[in-house]
């Protein structure tokens, strides 16, 4: 049997747990500064110091995790609100777009009718065989309204 030339000093200087350590609540342990913590840890055994530091680290991590959860939920709610808002705006713009397309189609139809009318007026008298079968515009001249312009109406 061999003996260890260096005796374990931790066994010689053994203190009772809690002998010098005042009891710290979780809130106190988390909220105190490192300097304050080190002052409280003076005179404690390595095991007690390790246990208190580990407990402090665990409590702080719990706080950070709770904070992250709250932040994540808040961000998710904000993104959901923005998504709904943008979806409503897209639907509104789609309705406006549809309305404008209908208006554009109506204006295009009127424009084409006016162009057709302008071409027939520019050609002069049209022979009945050359009249387009898809659209017919009738111009009526009245002797009473010879000095005023003739009202025009085209089917749209």
Curated annotation (Swiss-Prot):
Task: For the region Basic motif, give the residue spans.
Answer: 51-76
Where is the crosslink of kind Glycyl lysine isopeptide (Lys-Gly) (interchain with G-Cter in SUMO2)? Answer: 130
Domain bZIP span(s) in chain numbering: 51-114
Entry keyword annotation includes Mitochondrion: no
Q: Name one GO molecular function term.
A: transcription cis-regulatory region binding
Q: Where in the cell is it found?
A: Nucleus
Q: Which residues carry this modification: Phosphoserine?
A: 25
| Pfam families recorded | bZIP_Maf (PF03131)
Q: Name one GO cellular component term.
A: nucleoplasm
| The keyword Ubl conjugation is annotated on this UniProt entry | yes
Q: Which Gene3D superfamilies match?
A: 1.20.5.170
- Spans annotated as Leucine-zipper: 79-93
Instruction: Return one Gene Ontology term, BP aspect.
Output: regulation of transcription by RNA polymerase II
Key words of the record: DNA-binding, Isopeptide bond, Nucleus, Phosphoprotein, Repressor, Transcription, Transcription regulation, Ubl conjugation
Protein family according to the UniProt entry: Belongs to the bZIP family. Maf subfamily.
Q: How does it assemble?
A: Homodimer or heterodimer. It can form high affinity heterodimers with members of the CNC-bZIP family such as NFE2, NFE2L1/NRF1, NFE2L2/NRF2 and NFE2L3/NRF3.
The free-text function statement in the UniProt record for this protein reads: Since they lack a putative transactivation domain, the small Mafs behave as transcriptional repressors when they dimerize among themselves. However, they act as transcriptional activators by dimerizing with other (usually larger) basic-zipper proteins, such as NFE2, NFE2L1/NRF1, NFE2L2/NRF2 and NFE2L3/NRF3, and recruiting them to specific DNA-binding sites. Small Maf proteins heterodimerize with Fos and may act as competitive repressors of the NF-E2 transcription factor.
**What is the name attached to this protein's record?**
Transcription factor MafK
Taxon lineage = Eukaryota, Metazoa, Chordata, Craniata, Vertebrata
């Amino acid at each position: 049997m061999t003996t260890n030339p260096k005796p374990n000093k931790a066994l010689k200087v053994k203190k009772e747990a809690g002998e010098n350590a005042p009891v710290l609540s979780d809130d106190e342990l988390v909220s105190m500064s490192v300097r304050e913590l080190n002052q409280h840890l003076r005179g404690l055994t390595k095991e007690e110091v390790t246990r208190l530091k580990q407990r402090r680290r665990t409590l702080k991590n719990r706080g950070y995790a709770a904070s992250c959860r709250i932040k994540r939920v808040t961000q998710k709610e904000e993104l959901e609100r923005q998504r709904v808002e943008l979806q409503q705006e897209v639907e509104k713009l789609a309705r406006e777009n549809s309305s404008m397309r209908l208006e554009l189609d109506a204006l295009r139809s009127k424009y084409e009718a006016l162009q057709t009318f302008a071409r027939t007026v520019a050609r002069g008298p049209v022979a009945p065989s050359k009249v387009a079968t898809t659209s017919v515009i009738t111009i009526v001249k009245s002797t009473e309204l010879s000095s005023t312009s003739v009202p025009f109406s085209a089917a749209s």
